[in-house]
């Protein structure tokens, strides 16, 4: 193993499987949703920028820090969340209301959230789905998504960006996979869309356990995805798009190869893994950001902790910055816990208090009662 990968493995072990003590602790639950929110709010500033300079991101996040000895945030203007957080919250609210996954309730909450607050940056495709779901004549909540793109369904990252709550509510791998898929299929019917949501949910699931090494983390993800992507629908969907067989598995292998290199440019990461709105161009990228940033980064000051470093690095890759950062933030937050969520960043982001209440409620309903 190269120096970089060995250092990442050491970082995981040194953190004791994460800085948040016990597996599935309340600190990890809170850190997960907080990390997702911070990634969305901080990343949204740069969304759709093809290239983002690291210096610009560092300047942006440094503006959140107060002067030494001054509490709170230095910002006077709030950083607003996007559809990523709006959908994440709707998913969690449905899980809490039903104390289980309920596709009808969740679909209606997604659609009602859009209707109530449509200016959060929703894509045109998913708006069509929501409008159909709002029609009282809609009898099958999965049908609008299946009809997308001439019946092929969407392979965007919208199912993955909001999925963290599934990993918090369900503790078994089987349940995480099942309900990540079902929740994603409400808007993303292509296997290339919902398999991305499953991969993201599994990454959060493993982070909540505090997996002991980056190598083991990747091995487990790869084992699950190779099995999932072997099914007939996944093979067909990849073939129809002219992609390699098992696109997620192949990208996870690339993640491992990049981690084995001591120095990797951000341009190479984007070239190899992507930074786009397709789930296969963003979920593996978010996982790479989390694993790469377990160790110090030469261009990111050591005054930033591992969670902050993950978000800064994610955003510096450009492209779909808010979604890649929200996914990387959910994984990192689940791993490091609430201890690494800086108060100044919390106070800069819209909706932090509500998000924190949702995380604590999830822990009480699904973890403490189990």
UniProtKB/Swiss-Prot annotation:
**What's this protein's name?**
ADP-ribosylhydrolase ARH3
Q: Name one GO cellular component term.
A: mitochondrion
Q: Name one GO biological process term.
A: DNA repair
| Tissue occurrence | Ubiquitous.
Q: Which PANTHER family match?
A: ADP-RIBOSYLGLYCOHYDROLASE, ADP-RIBOSYLHYDROLASE ARH3
Residue(s) at site: Glutamate flap: 47
Q: Please summarize what the entry says happens upon disruption of the gene.
A: Knockout mice are phenotypically normal and fertile. 1 hour induced brain ischemia results in 100% fatality within 24 hours. 30 minutes of induced brain ischemia results in an increase in infarct size in the cortex, hippocampus, and striatum. Increased number of cortical neurons with nucleus-accumulated poly(ADP-ribose) and higher abundance of poly(ADP-ribose) in general.
Q: Where in the cell is it found?
A: Nucleus; Cytoplasm; Chromosome; Mitochondrion matrix
Enzyme Commission number(s): 3.5.1.-, 3.2.1.143, 3.2.2.-
Q: Which organism is it from?
A: Mus musculus (Mouse)
Alphabetical list of InterPro entries matching this protein = ADP-ribosylglycohydrolase, Ribosyl_crysJ1, Ribosyl_crysJ1_sf
Which positions are annotated as binding Mg(2+) 1? 82-84, 322
Q: Which family does it belong to?
A: Belongs to the ADP-ribosylglycohydrolase family.
- What is its cofactor? Mg(2+)
Could you tell me what this protein does?
ADP-ribosylhydrolase that preferentially hydrolyzes the scissile alpha-O-linkage attached to the anomeric C1'' position of ADP-ribose and acts on different substrates, such as proteins ADP-ribosylated on serine and threonine, free poly(ADP-ribose) and O-acetyl-ADP-D-ribose. Specifically acts as a serine mono-ADP-ribosylhydrolase by mediating the removal of mono-ADP-ribose attached to serine residues on proteins, thereby playing a key role in DNA damage response. Serine ADP-ribosylation of proteins constitutes the primary form of ADP-ribosylation of proteins in response to DNA damage.
């Amino acid at each position: 193993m190269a120096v970089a990968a060995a250092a990442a493995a050491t970082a995981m072990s040194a953190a004791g499987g994460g800085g948040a003590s016990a597996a599935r602790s309340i600190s990890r639950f809170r850190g997960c949703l907080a990390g997702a929110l911070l990634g969305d709010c901080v990343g949204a500033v740069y969304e759709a920028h093809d290239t983002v300079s690291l210096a610009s991101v560092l300047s942006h996040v440094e503006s959140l820090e107060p002067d030494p000895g001054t509490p709170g945030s230095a910002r006077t203007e709030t950083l607003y969340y996007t559809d990523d957080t709006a959908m994440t919250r709707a998913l969690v609210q449905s899980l809490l209301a039903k104390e289980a996954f309920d596709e009808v309730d969740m679909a209606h909450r997604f659609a009602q959230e859009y209707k109530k607050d449509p200016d959060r940056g929703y894509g045109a495709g998913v708006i069509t789905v929501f409008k159909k779901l709002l029609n009282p004549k809609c009898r099958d909540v999965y049908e609008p998504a299946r009809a997308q793109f001439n019946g092929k369904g969407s392979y965007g990252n919208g199912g993955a960006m909001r999925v963290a709550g599934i990993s918090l509510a369900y503790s078994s791998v089987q349940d995480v996979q099942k309900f990540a898929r079902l929740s994603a299929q409400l808007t993303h019917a292509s296997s290339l869309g919902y398999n991305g949501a499953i991969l993201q949910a599994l990454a959060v699931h493993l982070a909540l356990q505090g997996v002991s090494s980056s190598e083991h983390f990747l091995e487990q993800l790869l084992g699950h995805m190779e099995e999932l992507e072997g099914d007939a629908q996944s093979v067909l969907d990849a073939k129809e798009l002219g992609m390699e067989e098992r696109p997620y598995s192949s990208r996870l292998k690339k993640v491992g190869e990049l981690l084995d290199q001591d120095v990797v440019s951000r341009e190479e990461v984007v070239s190899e893994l992507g930074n786009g709105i397709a789930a296969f161009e963003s979920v593996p990228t978010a996982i790479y950001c989390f694993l790469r940033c377990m160790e110090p980064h030469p261009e990111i000051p050591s005054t930033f902790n591992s969670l902050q470093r993950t978000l800064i690095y994610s955003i510096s890759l450009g492209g779909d910055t808010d979604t890649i950062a929200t996914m990387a933030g959910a994984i990192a937050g689940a791993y490091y816990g609430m201890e690494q969520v800086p108060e100044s960043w919390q106070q800069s982001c819209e909706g932090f208090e509500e998000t924190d209440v949702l995380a604590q409620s999830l822990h009480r309903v699904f973890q403490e009662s189990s």
